[in-house]
Amino acid sequence: MIFRQMFDSVSSTYTYLLAGRPGGEALIIDPVIEKVDHYLRLPSELGLTLAKALDTHVHADHISGLGLLRDRTRCITVMGRQAKVDVVSMRLGDGDRVEIEGVSLTALYTPGHTDCSYCYVMDDRVFTGDTLLIRGTGRTDFQNGDARAAYRSIFEKLLTLPPATLVYPGHDYKGDTVSTIAEEKAFNPRLQVKSADEYAEIMANLKLPNPRQMDVAVPANLAIGFNAESPEIRAASLGAREVMQRLGSPQTLFVDLREESERARDGVIPGSLHLPYQQLRGNIKPGGLLAAMAAEPGRSVLLYCAFGERSALALQDMFANGIGNACHLKGGLDAWVKAGGPIETPRPRTTQG
């Protein structure tokens, strides 16, 4: 496994790069926008393809690099379901997994620092964002923070992990880089409490100033969605009601760009072909499966994903490869369900033997 911990000295933010093998896919956690060039140089040097970029919560102390990384690499952006950002490609709930080749993280919903905070567990380590720091914890006095919720997140979820679990936080202000669950239980001064009320009293009396970039960072981080307003993309963006009129038409090929776990959790539009977003590029080049299917006389291709970001990016790529008879479902399956569109359970994949 490839693992790198990177540090932004301005915001004291830790960013993490993970990959299963040299030359494989990579995932980045909590990127800072000013460091994007560095984040892109490192995977290039290691022969990695950035597949996913993840934020543990909506940050108040720096502007996220999620949007810029997506624009420059076409990676999938990931956040928790509770994050009130305009658009991300994939949203996770408690217990869901985010996966790339050779790496799997389990999402833990840990509200308290914010109401959209998540931690991510991977084998022997946990990425705690701003929920649990080294000898400290994330503040709870803004962004719908809740000290009692933070107490439950820490004591009922994080501190129940194996004692040797490595703790990799989203920030550090003293030069520490890693801890363990056992160390934090024993030595973190904010965790030497007997109740949620006692913890809430500590947090209420911290008297911390607001983060310097808060008034800029929070609005920016709520608006990281892909700009699908180019005339070409806008003309090929269909609302859910319009798409429903095409359902069942042999001339329209519905293509689901989501991952298998999303399909199993949320269902599919009936009659959809499954082609995960990460596999799209090879399939729209000359000789590719989707390119061949799109070339059939009278055929149109309708792309959809969870919220419309992956499908808009895919639409751009299809147009760039000369496939003009394509469109996408604006707002993705989320908009489809809200409009009352039919959903079915996908058939399980069968293995030939």
Please report, for each region that a protein language model flagged, where it lies by residue.
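Conserved beta-strand hairpin/beta-sheet module of binuclear metal-dependent hydrolase folds
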Residues: 1-49, 119-129, 135
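Residue-level marker for buried hydrophobic side chains located in beta-strands
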Residues: 27, 52-54, 127-128, 168, ...
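Accessory terminal helices/loops
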Residues: 152-166, 170-241, 245-248, 252, ...
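Positively charged, proline/Ser/Thr-rich regional signature most characteristic
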Residues: 230-303, 346
